[in-house]
């Protein structure tokens, strides 16, 4: 088992929490961050809204049926990026091995941290305390020997908590881990696993590598390693971007048409970055990762600069 010390920091209901900080009179009410419209989907939901079954990627129409009293606020991506920059400034006090996953989550390798703190759990506590002191927002953290385990652990004490998974407890932890907690296991894959008698990562571990390959394709190789607590991926430090991008990870498998409901949000976020950096774009690429980790990309390149109004349309044409 790796001797690395990896922290996965995940802000709690980030977009919704930022909006509640800006509009404290809404605290205690179910708040949804989304554009209103028949085809819109939720960007984020406060914990009060989640009690009614609301979650990101849910259609606004469905959300209004489940929780008619919810308060809807439009997203403010410029503000979210500003707050995210504050959070990353906190990270840099402890390590330069920071791998952002989105505005509200990142991996940190604190095996050798700037403050020489021996216990990664203590590093996570300090980081979470500093984030709260400087932004008024709470974060959850998972601490483990690798990225796979740290990401799972960060969800274990949400919200505003942390979970430490030391190397000697990994196998026992995985033995009872529900399959749905494994990244990449969506509804379709989970149903297939259950048909094979699998319920936990421990059940999955009893299958040979070749068997998993037969059942799940190339993803079977990845599963074989993950359920044994193996993930050698390094934390990739931030590098200067050669392109401007934005992305979203959906919490569950969705039909293509419903997933496409996120394109207006992504297009607006992308255009804000383009205008802020004072650059021009002539090509647009759409990347889609499927439940079994296949990546599909489509790129369109034009002879003229893309105007604001055309960006979302170009994304749909991809």
Swiss-Prot record:
Entry's Gene Ontology molecular function annotations: damaged DNA binding; DNA-directed DNA polymerase activity; magnesium ion binding
Catalytic activity: DNA(n) + a 2'-deoxyribonucleoside 5'-triphosphate = DNA(n+1) + diphosphate
Cofactor(s) required, per the database record: Mg(2+)
InterPro entries listed in its UniProt record: DNA/RNA_pol_sf (IPR043502), DNA_pol_Y-fam_lit_finger_sf (IPR036775), DNA_pol_Y-fam_little_finger (IPR017961), DNA_polymerase-Y (IPR050116), DNApol_IV (IPR022880), IMS_HHH_1 (IPR053848), Rev_trsase/Diguanyl_cyclase (IPR043128), UmuC (IPR001126)
A biological process from GO: error-prone translesion synthesis
Cofactor comment: Binds 2 magnesium ions per subunit.
Keywords for this protein: Cytoplasm, DNA damage, DNA repair, DNA replication, DNA-binding, DNA-directed DNA polymerase, Magnesium, Metal-binding, Mutator protein, Nucleotidyltransferase, Transferase
Active site: 105
GO cellular component, one term: cytoplasm
Biological role: Poorly processive, error-prone DNA polymerase involved in untargeted mutagenesis. Copies undamaged DNA at stalled replication forks, which arise in vivo from mismatched or misaligned primer ends. These misaligned primers can be extended by PolIV. Exhibits no 3'-5' exonuclease (proofreading) activity. May be involved in translesional synthesis, in conjunction with the beta clamp from PolIII.
Name assigned to this protein: DNA polymerase IV
Source organism of this protein record: Neisseria meningitidis serogroup B (strain ATCC BAA-335 / MC58)
């Amino acid at each position: 088992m790796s001797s690395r010390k990896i922290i996965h920091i995940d802000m709690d209901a980030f977009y919704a929490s930022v909006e509640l900080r800006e509009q404290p009179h809404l605290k205690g009410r179910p708040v949804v961050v989304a554009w209103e419209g028949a085809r819109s989907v939720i960007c984020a939901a406060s914990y009060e809204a989640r009690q009614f079954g609301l979650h990101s990627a849910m259609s606004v129409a469905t959300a209004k049926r489940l929780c008619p009293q919810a308060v809807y606020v439009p997203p403010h991506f410029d503000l979210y990026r500003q707050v995210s920059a504050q959070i990353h400034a906190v990270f840099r006090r402890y390590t330069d091995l920071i791998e952002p996953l989105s505005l509200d989550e990142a991996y940190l390798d604190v095996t050798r941290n700037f403050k020489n703190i021996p216990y990664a759990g203590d590093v996570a506590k300090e980081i979470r305390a500093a984030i709260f002191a400087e932004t008024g927002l709470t974060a959850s953290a998972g601490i483990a020997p690798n990225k796979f385990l740290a990401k799972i652990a960060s969800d274990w004490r949400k919200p505003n908590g942390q979970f430490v998974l030391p190397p000697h407890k990994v196998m026992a932890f995985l033995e009872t881990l529900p399959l749905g907690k494994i990244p990449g296991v969506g509804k379709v894959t989970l149903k297939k696993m259950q048909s094979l008698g699998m319920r936990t990562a421990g059940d999955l571990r009893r299958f040979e590598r070749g068997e998993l390959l037969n059942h799940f394709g190339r993803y079977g190789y990845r599963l074989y390693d993950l359920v044994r607590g193996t993930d050698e991926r390094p934390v990739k430090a931030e590098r200067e971007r050669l392109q401007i991008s934005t992305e979203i990870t959906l919490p569950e498998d969705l039909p293509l048409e419903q997933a496409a409901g996120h394109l207006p949000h992504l297009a607006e976020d992308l255009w804000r970055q383009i205008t802020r950096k004072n650059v021009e774009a002539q090509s647009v690429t759409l990347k889609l990762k499927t439940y079994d980790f296949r990546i599909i990309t489509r790129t369109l390149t034009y002879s003229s600069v893309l105007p604001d109004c055309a960006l979302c349309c170009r994304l749909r044409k991809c």
